[in-house]
From Swiss-Prot:
Residues 301-312, 326-339 have a biased composition (Low complexity). Mg(2+) 1 binds at residues 427, 581-582. PROSITE patterns: BRCT (PS50172), UMUC (PS50173). Residues 287-348, 1073-1114, 1134-1153 are annotated as: Disordered. The keyword Phosphoprotein does not apply. Residues 357-367, 664-667, 720-728 are annotated as: Interaction with target DNA. This is DNA repair protein REV1. GO terms for molecular function: damaged DNA binding; deoxycytidyl transferase activity; DNA-directed DNA polymerase activity; metal ion binding. One of its GO terms (biological process) is double-strand break repair. It is found in: Nucleus. Residues 287-300, 313-325, 1137-1153 have a biased composition (Polar residues). It comes from Gallus gallus (Chicken).
Length: 1255
């Protein structure tokens, strides 16, 4: 059919208006849609501009930002976005790469990079597109004419262009200067007239361009030029160019702009990490007569009268006391350069430096208090007597009130109903400030901040410091994401040195900067003035001149925190210590027992906290942790809010996504690009879309959290993963010896912390912060680290240690390999990981190191003989199966099965002196690298408790000992009356399946030692199987004995042929199953072995003769396959001929037994499919509104089926639920099914790479 034929046949009256009418209508529809979306976008963002008025773009190919983001930007700033290219209407083509054919086709068109749009928005006006052209005819050696473009006054938009008129770009970008002088460092100067013409529009009105960028309200600087270390330079610093530095900062970005504040001191309250809280407003000052200034260190008070030093005096002389008015009796000061030499400051080389630093570090105190409070809660739970004084008071109060209401016949129905699960979130209001002013009535109701500086907020500019360039570096780093910004080395001598000049362009400058002492906490009155936690004190003083500063009082903070937790502990011990001023409490049990409402309980707790501490607390309550935390936001300050289940949907829809845990700046930006700003918007996105954008786990988390679903429990105990000590404040070394001495001192600090935690560590990490090449020698913050590179080295020790000598030695070795410039070191840290409790290793290690092993033996051979004498004479050998499975298939990557000997009877008894908390990884001196903490699955079959030697059990390493004790605990619940499960030869016939890659390890019975040899050499394992950690822990004489034994065995001739190795050689041996056998087994057994064991349908067929034929081959893989075929077949095994040889395969088959059978997947106890169907039908038909706990239980049952590879039953269950739930009249059941199905599909996708087809 020729082109256009169908159109002619359609006729002119079809509504399209002739040829091309369809596309014209489509394009018009897209334009109308763009205009309508623009209006919606303007209402949502709250601002707009006309920067791109008259500009119509067409995006060709992949761009960064994406086409959707560029479309959104054009909506906001007055441009047009064309889905289809039009030569007559499209003004600019946006692309990052084009093929040669496209280049020729678009010859003469304006093809520019997407940076043109982004940087035009940053500049606040339409920039010239020429520097951003994707391709140009100008050769690389051809020079261009540097004419300055002329901008009309009406082109300038309110925004950064009125402050820094234009910024030089690396690629010779020529922009409008508007008579402003471009300084060498790229920051434009401006005069008083220009600012008056702009009607005072500066950084304070940047929110007109980006509405969500909250500003602190500082007026722009007037009548000054930017100080470049006090003097001018002739070289433009391209690595730290500033055209991106003047972008309006959001609240989150602004709170993190600091050119390297101290990590331990420079964070806001409750330990929130804010390393770069240097906002753009800190580049300005409201007074036009004040020169551009920064504060790289603490300031000195103008008052000359000084008082005694406060207990919180900071190291390096950064915190001194002077009298400063009635509201601040102490002040932080930093000496001027002329006085610095005369002041005694603490140095890292001083022996008391580390202790002084941590004694005055706020964040160190906060983290330490959290550990102490967590241990306090744990100790209460261990010593729980069941008596709660607070709860008893509530009962009495409730009884009295009920008696009064009974007289009037007005009993509360809500209090008599059984409450559902309820979590309470207790958060103190402005904790540091509240504690500081509780005895200061003169400060109540006034703007107050807790900080180390109480002066005027200014300090002298130190030589060598360059705050502007540090600010530019952090600004660019945040704006460009993780992109590394290169700082040329050659700038060292040109830019960073020679800061003695106090002139710039011939103008004298006041070398004072704003104080960079950070505010740890501020009152709500101060927050109303724009001050926030983490802001620099100098900037805060500009915002609020009446701001009153108070000093730290760590003893008072600790006292109040302990009081708060004691109050909570008087009601319940189900407490999770979040911080010194924050806690999560499970109050379900309290509400059930006292019959109070959540509001009544919260009110009682808040009143008691206020009465005892004189500080207020806010309380949020909800059915889970997420809702409780969100309710607290609404309750603050000094209030309480109970988010009821029926209010959750309406409440959470209006919440910003930034209020959800785990959503930071990066994720917020990505969600915004998808048009998602609130939880209501997020609910419209499917789980598949979220998982595609953010990954399976994060996508599922967002999907659940935006609906108010959170199954995280209140955790009272948290396993400690590491112990560390890091310092990045005041670190300055001049000689290698100083650094080495400091590392040794830090190792001693690590030892103290390990001993306090009762831990030993096996993995050491050394972290060093080194000044970045080209960065200022002196950072903007006094004593801070500045712009640095982070270097780390890690080593794994042979055995866990808490010795400062061992840690120091290994640390020095790693330090020497780094080959660093000592003078550039700015931070040092040591971290210890792979922790093991000291109490769990002391008994075994002390016995080994002293040469006295359990049972009074003095060597490994004696230990083995002692064990043999204590066991039954029928015991002939042990076998250990270590099965390794690919880690990519499952996290349960290894399975270790220890089979008991012949004649060992399994019982359910467990000796009372066996501790549940112990763990181990060794067996009779044989080391296994498998650790419970690495989440490996260990299944161990052990002898009965009556046959167990206590001394041997105590000598076992912690991980293996814990596994043995866990199996004994499981055996307590098992019964052995069933004849089908009667032990054979003292062994239970159940055996876990052995996965691919099985290795057979024989531990034969020890022969009597040969008198001529003096030691049984054959009983030793192969030298390659000896664990270095075990060997290193032996005493010196025992090591020598073992070395002699190995040397002696090497001299003995081989007496056994290779083919008789299995049956006659009693030495330890490893046999690997062949790939051929694996393939055959897989073909014969398409059903998973695990499912074969655990399926309840298969349990009835265990006695079938067809399934109990003995294995005819002696190979390990066939032997294991034979075990799987003979579960419970006692009669068949009796008919199998066996030899007297202990290593004969048929004889071994009678001993392959297990005492542990994992529980089959069940739904509330229902295992069979018919039972599950009945339970599901009853659940769906009798309940109109399903509970979250029930839905999660169904999800767990389905995921258990996936783990058991019972996909057939899973398919039936899902389809049955779909029929029932979709036939229900209640729409909530449809939502419940979608939620269940989404979770099941996620697990299936992760496990099998595919999903379930539900029709």
């Amino acid at each position: 059919m020729r082109r256009g034929g169908w159109r002619k046949r359609a006729g002119e009256g079809d509504g399209w208006g002739g040829w091309g009418g369809y596309m014209s209508a489509k394009v018009k529809k897209l334009e109308d849609q763009f205009r309508s979306d623009s209006a919606i976008q303007h209402q949502r963002d709250g601002n707009s501009s006309s920067i791109f008025s008259g500009v119509a773009i067409y995006v060709n190919g992949f761009t960064d930002p994406s086409a959707d983001e560029l479309r959104r930007l054009m909506m906001l700033h007055g441009g047009q976005y064309h889905v289809y290219y039009s030569r007559s209407k499209t003004t600019h083509i946006i692309a990052t790469n084009l093929p040669n054919a496209k280049i020729k086709e678009l010859k003469g068109e304006k093809v520019v990079r997407p940076e043109w749009i982004v940087e035009s928005i940053k500049a606040g006006r339409l920039l010239s597109h020429i520097p951003y052209q994707l391709y140009t005819k100008q050769s690389s050696v051809q020079k261009g004419l540097s004419f300055n473009s002329i901008c009309k006054p009406e082109d300038a938009m309110p925004g950064p262009s009125n402050i820094a008129k234009d910024l030089n770009r690396v690629n010779h970008i020529k922009q409008c200067e508007m008579e402003s002088e471009i300084t060498p460092n790229g920051i434009s100067s401006w005069n008083e007239e220009e600012e008056e013409d702009s009607d005072g529009l500066g950084f304070t009105k940047l929110d007109q361009i980006l509405p969500e960028r909250k500003q602190n309200g500082i007026q722009s600087h007037k009548d000054s030029t930017a100080i470049f270390n006090g003097h001018t330079h002739n070289t433009c610093i391209s690595a730290l160019k500033t055209q991106d530095c003047l972008v309006p900062s959001s609240n989150s970005v602004a709170s993190r702009f600091s050119p390297g504040p101290v990590q331990e001191e420079g964070k806001p309250e409750k330990g929130i990490v804010d390393f770069r809280d240097c906002t753009m407003q800190q580049l300005q000052q409201s007074n036009k007569n004040t020169d551009f200034s920064w504060n790289p260190h603490r300031t000195m008070s103008n008052s000359s009268s000084s008082s005694s030093l406060h207990s919180n005096t900071k190291i390096n002389g950064a915190h001194h006391s002077t009298v400063q008015g009635p509201s601040s009796t102490k002040s932080t000061s930093v000496p001027t350069p002329s006085k610095a030499a005369s002041l005694s400051v603490s140095k890292p080389s001083d022996c008391s430096f580390i202790s002084d630093f941590y004694s005055r570090s706020r964040l160190h105190h906060i983290s330490t208090w959290k550990c102490e409070l967590t241990e306090f809660v744990n100790s209460l739970q261990r010593k729980n007597s069941g008596v709660f004084p607070g709860r008893e008071k509530l009962k009495k109060w409730k009884a009295g009130r009920s008696a009064l209401k009974t007289d009037t016949g007005n009993v509360s129905v809500a209090s008599s109903a059984k409450p559902q699960s309820c979590i309470m979130h207790v958060d103190m209001d402005c904790f540091f400030v509240s504690v500081a002013i509780r005895n200061r009535p003169d400060l109540k109701g006034k703007p107050v901040a807790v900080t180390s500086n109480r002066g005027a907020g200014k300090a002298p500019l130190r030589p060598g410091a360059n705050p502007q360039l540090e600010w530019q570096y952090y600004q660019n780093k945040l704006l460009n994401g993780k992109a590394e910004i290169r700082i040329p080395d050659k700038l060292d001598s040109l830019v960073w040195e020679h800061s003695d000049s106090a002139h710039m362009n011939g103008v004298d400058c006041d070398l004072t900067v704003l104080s960079m002492a950070e505010i740890a906490s501020c009152s709500y009155e101060a927050r109303q003035a724009g001050i926030k936690n983490g802001m620099f004190f100098g900037q805060a003083k500009k915002l609020c001149p009446n701001l009153q500063a108070v000093s730290y009082d760590f003893n008072a903070y600790k006292e109040v925190a302990q009081t708060v937790y004691e109050i909570l502990a008087s009601y319940t011990h189900n407490i999770e210590a979040v911080s010194c001023d924050e806690a999560l409490v499970d109050i379900t049990e309290i509400l059930t027992e006292t019959r109070l409402t959540p509001d009544e309980l919260a009110n009682a707790i808040r009143d008691e906290i206020k009465a005892q501490t004189k500080c207020t607390a806010s309380v949020g309550m909800g059915s889970n942790i997420l809702l409780a935390r969100m309710a607290t936001r609404k309750a603050k300050p000094d209030g309480q809010y109970h988010l009821k289940p029926e209010e959750v949907d309406d409440f959470i829809r209006g919440q910003l996504v930034t209020n959800l845990p785990g959503v930071g700046r990066s994720m917020e930006s990505k969600l915004a690009s998808l048009g998602i700003r609130t939880c209501g918007d997020l609910q419209c996105a499917s789980m598949s879309k979220l998982q595609k954008e953010f990954g399976p786990k994060t996508g599922q988390m967002l999907y659940r959290f935006c609906r108010g679903l959170d199954d995280r429990p209140v955790r009272t105990e948290k396993e400690r993963k590491s112990v560390s000590a890091e310092i990045n404040y005041g670190i300055r070394f001049t000689q290698p010896k100083e650094a080495e001495a400091f590392l040794l001192s830090l190792s001693e600090e690590i030892q103290r912390r390990l001993e306090a935690a009762g831990m030993k560590g096996k993995r050491l990490t050394l972290k060093i912060m080194v000044r970045k090449a080209g960065a200022p020698v002196e950072p903007a913050k006094y004593g801070g680290h500045g712009i640095c590179d982070n270097i780390a080295r890690t080593v794994t020790l042979d055995h866990a240690t808490d010795s400062a000598k061992v840690i120091g030695k290994e640390t020095l070795n790693m330090f020497h390999t780094m080959k660093l410039n000592i003078s550039d070191m700015r931070g040092v840290g040591i971290q210890v990981q792979q922790l093991v409790p000291i109490s769990k290793t002391t008994s075994a290690q002390s016995a080994v190191q002293s040469g006295r092993l359990p049972g009074g033996s003095h060597s490994v051979i004696d230990l083995l003989h002692v064990q043999k004498a204590k066991k039954c004479s029928e015991e002939e050998h042990k076998e250990v199966f270590v099965a390794a499975m690919d880690l990519e298939i499952s996290s349960d990557s290894r399975t270790c099965t220890v089979l008991p000997s012949r004649g060992t009877h399994l019982t359910a008894g467990l000796n009372s002196n066996v501790s549940k908390t112990d763990s181990a990884v060794k067996l009779n001196g044989l080391h296994s690298p498998i650790s419970v903490k690495s989440r490996l699955n260990l299944s161990i079959e052990v002898p009965s408790a009556s046959q167990l030697d206590k001394s041997v059990l105590e000598a076992l390493p912690p991980d293996l000992r814990e596994q043995v004790e866990q199996i004994y605990t499981i055996q307590q619940g098992e019964t052995y009356g069933d004849s089908k499960r009667e032990p054979i030869n003292g062994c239970n016939t159940a055996l876990l399946s052995q996965p691919v890659g099985t290795v057979l390890l024989q531990v034969p019975e020890l022969q009597e030692p040969n008198a001529n040899m003096g030691i049984n050499v054959i009983a030793l394992p192969a030298f390659s199987q000896v664990d270095p950690e075990v060997f290193a822990a032996l005493p010196a004489e025992l090591q020598a004995e073992l070395k002699d034994a190995y040397d002696q065995r090497q001299k003995q001739p081989e007496q056994q042929p290779a083919n008789a190795f299995v049956s006659k050689n009693p030495c330890l041996q490893l046999k690997h199953a062949t790939t051929k056998n694996k393939k055959k087994i897989r073909k014969k057994n398409p059903v998973s072995p695990v499912k074969k064991i655990q399926s309840p349908l298969k349990n009835k067929l265990l006695g079938s003769p067809a399934k109990n034929m003995p294995a005819a081959s002696g190979s390990p893989q066939k032997l294991i396959d034979g075990f799987l075929k003979q579960e419970g077949a006692a009669a068949q095994l009796e008919a199998v001929p066996s030899t007297s040889d202990a290593s004969d395969p048929s004889a071994l088959q009678t001993e392959q037994c297990g005492s542990f059978r994992p529980q089959a997947p069940n739904l509330a106890g229902a295992v069979e499919f018919n039972d599950v169907k009945t339970l599901l039908k009853e659940w769906i038909t009798t309940i109109s509104d399903p509970m979250e706990e029930d839905i999660l239980q169904v999800v767990k049952y389905c995921t258990d089926l996936i783990e058991e590879k019972d996909l057939e039953k899973l398919d039936l269950v899902v389809k049955y639920m779909k029929r029932l739930m979709q036939s229900s009249v209640e729409s909530v059941w449809n939502m419940a099914f979608d939620f269940i199905l989404d979770n099941v599909q996620v697990v299936l996708q992760q496990t099998y790479g595919s999903t379930l087809k539900v029709i």
